């Protein structure tokens, strides 16, 4: 049961919906069908999700008129979960959505993000946002020795500013520094990249794909 305040005109709902990959997905979907306000759907690209049929996923979301936008979020390993999904697998899954023949009746946020990155309008660094932890401290996303994400707590805003200033050199490898998308790629938080064998969390492969597709369309329309 939703609080009546959620049904006011200036509200919209953000719903995590991973289809059958998450418990009680049928109940979540039924609630989405009954929602009188717009819904922004977030899908976590877990191993179960990326194995699903994309055309069927789009068809089901199209059937829910309240869904106005859909974003596929990459899975990042942490202390609680360690699913095996590579960055390259995430890229390939998003490409399936981009190439799907079923028309989307909703806004596909990932497409917008790709366009913003290619236009160098997206800031990939953490200098424009900061988290507040349950302990009342400032928080930034860091990665431990096993490359699992965690929140690093900072006592003061000055400490956060110092951390953000050091991020481009401390958290970014030579692979990142030599990349043409550096500073504007699709990463939510920079992490150390050793090589591009399985892609990177800036999703260079996805940006390369989109740029090539754009050039191909331009040539075919010339």
What are these regions (language model features)?
Residues 145-222:
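Flexible mid-to-C-terminal extensions adjoining Fe-S/redox cofactors in radical SAM and related proteins
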Residues 25, 51, 80-82, 189, ...:
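Short acidic, gly/pro-rich beta-turn/loop elements at beta-sheet edges
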Residues 44, 109, 188-191:
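Acidic carboxylate-rich catalytic motifs and surrounding loops in phosphoryl-/glycosyl-chemistry enzymes
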Residues 66-69, 75-148, 182-184:
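A C-terminal junction/extension of Radical SAM enzymes
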């Amino acid at each position: 049961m939703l609080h009546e305040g959620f049904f006011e005109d200036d509200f919209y709902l953000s719903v995590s919906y991973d289809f059958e990959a998450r418990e009680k997905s049928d109940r979540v979907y039924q609630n989405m069908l009954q929602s009188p306000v717009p819904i922004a759907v977030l899908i976590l690209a877990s191993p179960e999700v990326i194995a699903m049929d994309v055309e069927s996923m789009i068809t089901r979301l199209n059937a829910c008129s309240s869904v106005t936008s859909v974003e596929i979020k990459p899975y990042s390993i942490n202390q609680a979960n360690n699913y095996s999904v590579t960055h390259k697998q995430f890229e390939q899954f998003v490409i399936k959505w981009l190439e799907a023949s079923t028309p989307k009746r909703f806004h596909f946020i990932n497409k917008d993000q790709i366009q913003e990155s290619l236009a160098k309008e997206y800031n990939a660094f953490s200098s424009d946002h900061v988290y507040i932890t349950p302990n009342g401290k400032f928080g930034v996303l860091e990665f431990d020795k096993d490359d699992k994400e965690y929140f690093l707590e900072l006592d003061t805003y000055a400490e956060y500013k110092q951390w953000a200033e050091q991020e481009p050199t401390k958290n970014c490898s030579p692979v990142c520094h030599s990349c043409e998308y550096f500073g504007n790629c699709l990463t939510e938080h920079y992490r150390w990249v050793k090589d591009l064998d399985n892609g990177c969390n800036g999703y260079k492969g996805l940006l390369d794909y989109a740029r090539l597709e754009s050039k191909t369309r331009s040539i075919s329309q010339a």
